[in-house]
Amino acid sequence: TNVLFSLSKRDKKINKYFGLDFPNKVGVAGGLDKNANYFHVLGKLGFGFVEVGTITLKPQSGNPKPRIHRFSNEETIINSLGFNNVGSVKALENIERNKKNFSGILGVSIGKGKEISNERAHEDYLHLLDYFKDVADYYAINISSPNTNDLRLSLIHISEPTRQSL
């Protein structure tokens, strides 16, 4: 049963966005379940949607540790995880194994591999969009990694080919 959220019961209002019927408005963003190991459990806790990842085409170990830095004087924490994940093949296996136990909306956060140039990033994204097409209800294209040089600039190379593929 849903133990955390009273919102876990279907809202009386219709929560239909972009053709998807969300059970409720409370979800989990990418980063918590990087490898799609327990998204189905998060659904049982009452989340109406869960985003897994960020997932890259090939497995990545992420940045060297320590990856999380606390600055007490500024009351801040900075993460520089580096998209550590098991890669698309294993992540898809995990999703396929657990999706039958999940009734919410499943998002897949995708990112370019660190060995791929920004000019070729669209190739990774297009492959990942195609690879997860049968299991993802929506995608989040993660271009926010602050420790990947000029990743946001790769949006120029990503946007048109990605839009054309959809």
Language model: regions and residue ranges:
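Single conserved hydrophobic/aromatic residue that forms the stacking wall/gate
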Residues: 156-166
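A gly/proline- and charged-residue-enriched helix-loop-helix capping module
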Residues: 58-102
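Active-site mouth loops of central-metabolism enzymes
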Residues: 22-34, 110-124
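An N-cap/entry alpha-helix motif that binds or orients negatively charged groups
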Residues: 1-15, 76-84, 88
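N-terminal amphipathic alpha-helix/helix-capping segment at the start of soluble metabolic enzymes
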Residues: 6-27, 92-96, 102
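Hydrophobic faces of well-ordered beta-strands that scaffold small-molecule active sites
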Residues: 26-30, 50-52, 106-110, 139-142
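Glycine-rich, proline-tolerant flexible connector loops at the mouths of alpha/beta enzymes
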Residues: 54-65, 140-154
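Active-site cofactor/substrate anionic-group-binding motifs, chiefly glycine-
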Residues: 42-57
